[in-house]
A protein has these predicted regions:
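Small/polar beta-strand repeat architecture
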Residues: 2-84, 112-116, 124-127
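Short, ordered beta-strand-loop transition motifs
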Residues: 9-15, 90-91, 111, 289-293
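Beta-sheet repeat architectures centered on beta-propellers
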Residues: 51, 55-62, 66-67, 77-80, ...
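Short beta-strand segments and strand-loop junctions that repeat across beta-rich extracellular domains
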Residues: 58, 104-108, 151-177, 311-317, ...
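Beta-propeller and closely related beta-pinwheel folds
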Residues: 68-81, 113-285
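Hydrophobic or amphipathic alpha-helical targeting/insertion segments
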Residues: 93-107, 112-116
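Hydrophobic beta-strand segments that make up the repeating blades of beta-propeller
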Residues: 96-97, 203, 247, 341
Length: 468
């Protein structure tokens, strides 16, 4: 009965705690009369890895820093405690993982799904395994495990710019010898490694001010390291992703692409994103891809939220951007284990994306809204009197419709008002409307269940209509 997982109920002292025993149905059980109270000599307790913090926390003042490091009454420099981030990779059929700033863990598939990951130091033949790292990643063509921001051999002190790697095909051997390929290198540009992304026959490592390209070159050096560029980085350890044979990444105030060199991505929503951005929770930013629709997406916290509540998406084929609100904390694209993108919400649920047209069985507000447009740089009023819609409906169980809304204002800082709306169905050829303003925008929207539609190139009958 006791061979289950338990949460600690009470702390007795520094060396003791209690749990509430339960049966396989979850009901509380008590000891029988013959129980001696010590559990016997064969009881083994295995502890889960500390889940860590779910927020970035910073502070200063009394109690921060070391005793005696400053004068009485003097302030101390700030301290920070980072939220828990994981890097996970495949090593053949096995899985390796690393909590940022923690140890290295290995899960062996042959031991079965019910077994736990174990520390690398417990592997057979383990030698000089890193005790701390900020990320681990496998070099795909040669099967070395790289530990970024690891401790140096013989110490427990983390070196935030040190890259260490194990012997080829040997996750346990980290001692460099003339007879193996284990080794290390310290990067020079920057003060810490932010993260890394694997791409075509190389690994791109981001420090806080630079990008490095790491390539397998074989003995005696094993890896060659080239500085790609300085003055750019990525905003968080998971803010870069490999998609369409390129790496797309978000920095503190812009978006970039790496294709052998680094270029900025022209972004029409840049001010919208970075003018309302919670930099105190910047490490929660992560990048995701949706290969089916040629998209990369960054999820981030707006300035008024400590949890992810927004996203910005770039379509790398059409070279267009769109924005929205959504709380997701992790994302997995279509692969061998799923036929739809799978994402995690802040409510501890996993969601299938791109499946159906409803939001978990309820109606979903789906819309496409343009930016403002004008005629003659806003010197002329516009008059619109006709819409020729281009909407494809499919898979709907009823007579589906969408609503076209024309929003207007006469001055850039004026209030947007909805001037006219038009309901459009599958048989609508043309819709007559009336709206006049210097600036307009168009919103196409549906709010009912089972309404799956796709927007094409809508045409509008617009003419200039004077200056006042």
């Amino acid at each position: 009965v006791l061979n289950q997982e338990y949460q600690i109920a009470t702390i007795v002292n520094a060396n003791s705690y209690t749990i509430e025993a339960k049966d396989t149905d979850g009901a509380t059980v008590t000891a029988n009369a013959s129980d001696t109270g010590n559990g016997g000599s064969s009881v083994v307790g295995a502890y889960q890895i500390n889940v860590g913090l779910d927020d970035y926390v910073s502070g200063f003042g009394f109690g921060s820093g070391y005793f005696g490091e400053s004068s009485w009454g003097g302030g101390t420099s700030g301290f920070s405690s980072q939220l828990r981030l994981w890097s996970i990779d495949n090593f053949g059929e096995d899985m390796i993982s690393n909590p940022r700033g923690g140890g290295l863990f290995y899960w062996d598939k042959t031991n079965g799904e019910s077994t736990r990951s174990v520390n690398f130091s417990s592997l057979s033949g383990a030698s000089d395994v890193p005790t701390i790292a900020n990320q681990i990643i496998v070099s795909e063509t040669d099967r070395h495990i790289l530990a970024l921001g690891a401790n140096t051999i013989g110490t427990s002190t983390q070196d935030s710019m040190l890259v260490r790697w194990c012997n080829q095909e040997d996750a346990a051997m980290w001692t460099p010898k003339t007879t193996n390929t284990a080794g290390s290198i310290r990067l020079s540009a920057g003060s810490k490694i932010i993260g890394a992304v694997r791409t075509r026959e190389e690994i791109i490592i981001f420090t806080d001010i630079a990008l490095y390209a790491v390539q397998f070159i074989g003995p005696p050096f094993t890896f060659g390291v080239n500085l790609v560029t300085q003055s750019v980085s990525m905003v968080s350890p998971q803010a870069a992703i490999n998609a369409n044979n390129a790496i797309y990444f978000m920095d503190e105030d812009n978006f970039y692409i790496y294709e052998g060199g680094v270029q900025s991505l022209p972004c029409t929503v840049r001010a919208y994103v970075f003018d309302d951005f919670n930099y105190s929770q910047v490490y929660k930013v992560f990048a995701a891809k949706n290969a089916k629709f040629n998209e990369v997406t960054w999820f981030y916290c707006s300035s008024s939220s400590t949890e992810i509540d927004r996203y910005v998406t770039y379509n790398y084929l059409d070279k267009v951007w769109h924005i929205g609100n959504m709380d997701r904390t992790a994302w997995m694209d279509i692969g061998s284990s799923t036929d739809a993108p799978l994402a995690a919400g802040t409510n501890n649920y996993l969601y299938d994306h791109e499946t159906g047209s409803n939001a978990d069985g309820s109606a979903m507000t789906a819309f496409v809204e343009s930016a403002d447009f004008d005629a003659g740089d806003g010197n002329q009023f516009m008059f619109i009197n006709r819409i020729i819609p281009d909407v494809l409906f499919y898979g709907s169980s009823t007579d589906p419709t969408v609503t076209y809304s024309i929003k207007t204002r006469n001055y850039p800082l004026g209030t947007l008002t909805t001037a006219t709306t038009a309901s459009v169905g599958s048989s609508t050829g043309v819709s007559n409307v009336r709206a006049r303003a210097r600036q307009m925008r168009v919103r196409v929207e549906s709010t009912d269940e089972d309404n799956l539609w796709r927007l094409g190139d809508t045409r509008f009958d617009i003419r200039q209509d004077g200056r006042r």
